[in-house]
Amino acid sequence: MNYIAAAIAIMGAAIGAGYGNGQVISKTIESMARQPEMSGQLRTTMFIGVALVEAVPILGVVIALILVFAV
């Protein structure tokens, strides 16, 4: 049962992060197309946003490992 819970935790985190990264990058590219002179600042902000979104699957993996190796 712990393995199923771990798999669901990782799956949910991966799907959510994939969707979130897609939205962040999509909106950044859209903004760069509207204002090319802001592309440097937008790119920096995008990388920060992607890093924050990627924290979710990392936490999902940690929770999954706790579920699998819990006594």
Swiss-Prot record:
Keywords: ATP synthesis, Cell membrane, CF(0), Hydrogen ion transport, Ion transport, Lipid-binding, Membrane, Transmembrane, Transmembrane helix, Transport. PROSITE patterns: ATPASE_C. GO terms for molecular function: lipid binding; proton-transporting ATP synthase activity, rotational mechanism. One of its GO terms (cellular component) is plasma membrane. It is a multi-pass membrane protein. The keyword Transmembrane helix applies. InterPro entries: ATP_synth_csu_bac/chlpt, ATP_synth_F0_csu, ATP_synth_F0_csu_DDCD_BS, ATP_synth_F0_csu_sf, ATPase_proteolipid_c-like_dom, F/V-ATP_Csub_sf. Coiled coil: none annotated. Pfam families: ATP-synt_C (PF00137). The chain crosses the membrane at residues 4-24, 47-67. It is found in: Cell membrane. NCBIfam families: ATP_synt_c (TIGR01260), PRK06876.1 (NF005363). HAMAP family: ATP_synth_c_bact. F(1)F(0) ATP synthase produces ATP from ADP in the presence of a proton or sodium gradient. F-type ATPases consist of two structural domains, F(1) containing the extramembraneous catalytic core and F(0) containing the membrane proton channel, linked together by a central stalk and a peripheral stalk. During catalysis, ATP synthesis in the catalytic domain of F(1) is coupled via a rotary mechanism of the central stalk subunits to proton translocation. F-type ATPases have 2 components, F(1) - the catalytic core - and F(0) - the membrane proton channel. F(1) has five subunits: alpha(3), beta(3), gamma(1), delta(1), epsilon(1). F(0) has three main subunits: a(1), b(2) and c(10-14). The alpha and beta chains form an alternating ring which encloses part of the gamma chain. F(1) is attached to F(0) by a central stalk formed by the gamma and epsilon chains, while a peripheral stalk is formed by the delta and b chains. Belongs to the ATPase C chain family. Dicyclohexylcarbodiimide (DCDD) binding to the active glutamate residue inhibits ATPase in vitro. This is ATP synthase subunit c.
